[in-house]
Amino acid sequence: MERIIFLALLCLSLNKQANAQNLQTNYKTKYVYILVIDGPRYSETYGEPTCKYSPILCDSLKHEGTFYANFKNNGPTYTVPGHTAIVTGTYQRISNAGTALPKEPNIFQYFLKATGKDSTAAYVVASKGKLDVLVNTSHKKWNNQFVASTYCGPNGNGLGYGRDDKTFAKTTELLQSANPPQLMLINLLAVDVYGHANNWDKYLESITQTDLYAAKLWQMIQENPALRNQTTLFITNDHGRHLDGVRSGFVNHGCRCEGCRHISLLVLGPDTPKGVVVTEESEMTDISKTIADILHFEMPTSKGELLRTAFPLK
């Protein structure tokens, strides 16, 4: 009798393992990239009726994927906290100067631990040097463990602000290498910098330039046989900017007004339906949970939820 019970339990366990493996084979995605366009207001991007500042993202690319029209930053609306929410799946008040590490582990650490890959399999490439804090955590069980590679700032050393064209050149170099990163976040800063400089014309020009960068990034993915039909691209923001009439308007951000909280998300990839617009609210913490699901690693510290419309296999 005990033998029969043992065999029954063994069969049940094997069936569960087989089902889990079958679920894992469903996703075509093997590479995941996140492009963060730093600090545009929704009213100048997808919310602009004629799409004149982002003609590619708002039109042709939007039709190639699933667009979240009511995507939010529901935490502190600053650069480091916003990026931290994306990669950890948690909101926290953290220094925006890059002088403190996030409190929770991130997608890169969970991914590297789960896969056993070396640090170059996961990357943060950022125009803002302070974003090199994204790959580490102050969590005592994870601090300095499974730390991804970084190239942040003008010389990749985590100091200062670099030019977006240099950041994109580094991104291009990595994508065209023999072994592209499997998981990567890219930050482009110009929109945010010119907003803070109160330079409206340059702010708008930078939105258009990042539109071109986004299109070029997707094009490079499609032209690379290793990445084509195996890569999901998330295009999003870390925060918006004050609405007109709120404090200093587009010049700054950091409050909980709709302008600061309303950001965008466009998901492109082989597992994602085309031409779908999601109007229900989702938030930036959902990105981490979704990436964990499609790349098959556990991320228990993330507070996000799976973006099911973009990945309807589950």
Spans of model-derived segments:
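Bacterial Sec-dependent N-terminal signal peptides
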Residues: 1-25
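Active-site-proximal N-terminal segment of extracellular/periplasmic enzymes that hydrolyze or transfer
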Residues: 21-65
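Structural recognition of the beta-strand scaffold that forms the well-ordered cores
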Residues: 32-36, 43, 67-71, 85-87, ...
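Metal-dependent active-site segment of extracytoplasmic phospho-/sulfohydrolases and closely related
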Residues: 33-34, 211-251, 291
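Active-site segment of extracytoplasmic enzymes that catalyze sulfate/phosphate-ester chemistry
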Residues: 59-102
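Substrate-binding rim/cap in mid-to-C-terminal beta-strand-loop elements of soluble/periplasmic
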Residues: 81-88, 252-295, 313
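Catalytic-site neighborhoods of secreted/periplasmic enzymes
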Residues: 93-159
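Active-site His/acidic residue clusters
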Residues: 135-154, 169-212, 216
